[in-house]
C-alpha cells in the first residue's frame, strides 16, 4: 500500500462467472497512487486470500475502467482523462493474463510459412463425426513439403507434391488437409484419423496422397481459409483473385491439367519436374468461383465467424474487401494508406484486425458504414517490421496474437493499445536479421505456435493466458 494521502472513492465489480471471486460493491477509498498490483492486493484482501494455504493463494487481477485496461496508476489515469480525485470510479476486475512461457521447439527442414492445429474440440473434428486422441500441428514449408507433427515433436507424415514453396496449410478434418503454394496450386490431401475412419470418397486414395489438385490461380497462392459448416475453402492469390472451392472435389468441375511454365517449377530440381509429370494422373478441379476486384496481390482471406456466406480479404492494393460468397460479388471496400498483409476476426466484437506493411495493426468494424469518415476503430503499435500473421485467442474474445518479420510474436488485448506480452525466438539459429516470423496459430490445448525463418516450430503457453 502507498503512503500517498490522496485517496479516491471506488467500487469493484466483476463479470467473472466464478461466484467465489465476487466481492461487495460497497464503495471504499484507496490511494490514487495504486496500480494494478496494489489494486489486486486490495481485491485479494476483500476475498480473504491471505496466502496461508492453497485455497487462499492471492490471484493476480487486471482492472478495467469503462472497458479499457488500466496500465498506469489511478492518478495517471485521472490526469490523462482530465478527472479529479473527487471522481467516483467503478473498477472492473478480471483474472490477469499471465506471461506465455516457452514450452517446446520442433525442428523443420526449411523456413516455415504456415501453421495450423487440430484437436478434439475444434469444428474440423466435431463437425466431421470423427475422433482424434491427441492434438496435432500442421506445417507448410519453403522446401515444398507439408508435415504433420505430434506433440512429442515427431513428424508423423510428410505430404510431397507441390513443385515450389508451400505458402498456406489448413486442416479440413482429421482425414483431410488442404495446402497451397508458389506453384499456383491448391491441393486436397488424404491423411488418416486416429480411429481409422475414412470418408467414402477418400477410400481409393492412399494415406499422404493428393485427392485432388484445385487449379484456377495464375500466380502463387499464399493464404487459405476453411469453413467447416459449409465445407468451403477460400484461397488468396498473387494474381489479384480469390478462389472459392469445396472441400469435396466431387462438387467441382473436372478440368485438364494446366500447362506448366518453366519459371514456375524449380529450375534446379529434376525431381520436381518429374513430380509435375506424375501429377498428370491426379484428378483436377476448377473453382466454384473466382472473385475479382483487387488490383494487387491478395495477401490473406478469411470467412466471417458467424456467416459462411461472407468473406473478407486484404491486399497489397491497401484495401479490405467484403465478399458475398453467394453472388461472388464484392459488397464493401475499405481503403488504407499501406499494404495489408494479414487479417483475423475477433468472435464477439466482430472486429477485423489487419496487419500491415506499416508495422502496425488496425482494428476495423465491418458493421460501420463505408461512408463514415472514421473506419478504423483503433491502431495497435509495437512491431518494428511487417505484420504478416494474426491468430485470435481461442478462449478470450478480446485477445489475439500477431507474428512479424521483426522476429517476435505479440499478444494483444483490444481493450488497450499496447501489447500485453512479446514472445521472442528461443532457437540459437534465430540471429538478428534472420529471425522473421511468418506464421502464428493459437490453439486452446497446445498454446501459441509460431514458425518462420529459424526453421523451428515454437510453442509458448501461459497459465490462464486464454481465460
From Swiss-Prot:
Principal cellular location given in the protein's record: nucleus
UniProt-recorded Gene Ontology molecular function terms: ribonucleoprotein complex binding
Localization per Swiss-Prot or TrEMBL: Nucleus, Nucleolus; Nucleus, Nucleoplasm
UniProt organism field: Scheffersomyces stipitis (strain ATCC 58785 / CBS 6054 / NBRC 10063 / NRRL Y-11545) (Yeast)
Keyword Isomerase appears in the UniProt entry: no
InterPro entries cross-referenced by the UniProt entry: G-protein_beta_WD-40_rep (IPR020472), NLE (IPR012972), WD40/YVTN_repeat-like_dom_sf (IPR015943), WD40_repeat_dom_sf (IPR036322), WD40_rpt (IPR001680), WDR12/Ytm1 (IPR028599)
Statement: the UniProt record of this protein carries the keyword rRNA processing: yes
Pfam families referenced in this protein's UniProt entry, alphabetically: NLE, WD40
The protein's name: Ribosome biogenesis protein YTM1
Sufficient for interaction with ERB1 and association with 66S pre-ribosomes: region residues: 105-467
Domain of life assignment: Eukaryota
Record family assignment: Belongs to the WD repeat WDR12/YTM1 family.
Mapped WD repeat ranges: 120-159, 161-199, 216-255, 293-333, 335-374, 382-422, 432-467
Summary of the function given for this chain in its UniProt record: Component of the NOP7 complex, which is required for maturation of the 25S and 5.8S ribosomal RNAs and formation of the 60S ribosome.
CDD domains: WD40 (cd00200)
Gene3D superfamilies assigned to the protein according to its UniProt record, in alphabetical order: YVTN repeat-like/Quinoprotein amine dehydrogenase
Region described as Ubiquitin-like (UBL) domain: 8-95
Summary of subunit composition and partner proteins: Component of the NOP7 complex, composed of ERB1, NOP7 and YTM1. The complex is held together by ERB1, which interacts with NOP7 via its N-terminal domain and with YTM1 via a high-affinity interaction between the seven-bladed beta-propeller domains of the 2 proteins. The NOP7 complex associates with the 66S pre-ribosome. Interacts (via UBL domain) with MDN1 (via VWFA/MIDAS domain).
Amino acid at each position: 500500500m502507498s503512503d500517498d494521502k490522496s485517496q479516491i472513492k471506488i467500487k469493484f465489480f466483476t463479470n467473472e462467472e466464478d461466484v467465489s471471486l465476487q466481492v461487495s460493491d460497497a464503495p471504499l477509498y484507496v490511494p490514487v497512487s495504486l496500480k494494478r498490483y496494489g489494486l489486486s492486493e486490495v481485491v485479494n484482501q476483500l476475498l480473504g486470500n491471505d496466502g496461508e494455504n492453497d485455497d487462499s493463494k492471492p490471484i493476480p487481477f487486471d482492472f478495467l475502467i469503462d472497458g479499457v485496461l488500466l496500465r498506469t496508476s489511478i492518478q495517471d489515469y485521472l490526469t490523462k482523462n482530465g478527472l479529479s480525485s473527487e471522481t467516483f470510479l467503478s473498477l472492473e476486475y478480471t483474472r490477469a493474463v499471465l506471461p506465455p512461457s516457452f514450452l517446446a521447439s520442433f525442428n523443420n527442414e526449411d523456413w516455415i510459412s504456415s501453421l495450423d492445429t487440430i484437436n478434439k474440440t475444434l469444428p474440423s473434428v466435431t463437425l466431421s463425426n470423427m475422433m482424434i486422441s491427441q492434438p496435432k500441428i500442421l506445417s507448410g514449408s519453403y522446401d515444398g513439403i507439408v508435415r504433420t507433427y505430434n506433440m512429442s515433436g515427431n513428424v508423423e507424415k510428410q505430404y510431397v507434391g507441390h513443385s515450389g514453396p508451400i505458402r498456406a496449410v489448413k486442416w479440413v478434418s482429421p482425414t483431410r488437409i488442404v495446402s497451397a503454394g508458389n506453384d499456383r496450386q491448391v491441393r486436397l490431401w488424404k491423411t488418416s484419423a486416429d480411429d481409422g475412419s475414412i470418408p467414402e470418397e477418400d477410400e481409393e486414395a492412399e494415406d499422404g496422397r493428393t485427392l485432388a489438385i484445385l487449379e484456377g490461380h495464375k500466380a502463387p497462392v499464399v493464404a487459405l481459409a476453411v469453413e467447416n459448416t459449409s465445407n468451403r475453402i477460400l484461397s488468396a492469390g498473387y494474381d489479384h483473385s480469390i478462389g472459392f472451392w469445396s472441400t469435396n472435389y466431387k462438387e467441382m468441375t473436372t478440368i485438364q491439367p494446366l500447362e506448366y511454365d518453366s519459371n514456375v517449377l524449380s529450375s534446379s530440381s529434376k525431381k520436381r519436374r518429374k513430380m509435375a509429370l506424375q501429377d498428370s494422373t491426379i484428378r483436377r478441379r476448377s473453382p466454384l468461383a473466382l472473385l475479382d476486384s483487387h488490383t494487387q496481390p491478395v495477401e490473406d482471406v478469411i470467412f466471417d465467424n458467424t456467416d459462411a456466406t461472407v468473406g473478407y480479404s486484404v491486399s497489397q492494393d491497401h484495401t479490405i474487401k467484403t465478399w458475398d460468397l453467394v453472388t461472388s460479388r464484392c459488397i464493401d471496400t475499405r481503403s488504407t494508406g499501406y499494404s495489408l498483409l494479414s487479417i483475423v476476426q475477433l468472435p464477439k466484437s466482430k472486429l477485423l484486425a489487419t496487419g500491415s506493411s506499416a508495422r502496425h495493426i488496425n482494428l476495423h468494424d465491418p458493421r460501420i458504414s463505408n461512408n463514415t469518415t472514421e473506419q478504423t476503430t483503433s491502431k495497435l503499435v509495437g512491431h518494428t517490421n511487417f505484420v504478416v500473421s494474426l491468430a485470435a485467442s481461442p478462449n478470450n474474445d478480446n485477445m489475439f496474437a500477431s507474428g512479424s518479420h521483426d522476429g517476435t510474436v505479440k499478444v494483444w488485448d483490444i481493450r488497450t493499445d499496447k501489447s500485453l506480452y512479446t514472445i521472442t525466438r528461443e532457437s540459437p539459429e534465430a540471429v538478428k536479421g534472420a529471425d522473421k516470423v511468418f506464421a502464428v496459430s493459437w490453439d486452446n490445448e497446445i498454446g501459441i505456435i509460431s514458425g518462420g525463418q529459424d526453421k523451428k516450430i515454437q510453442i509458448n503457453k501461459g497459465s490462464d493466458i486464454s481465460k
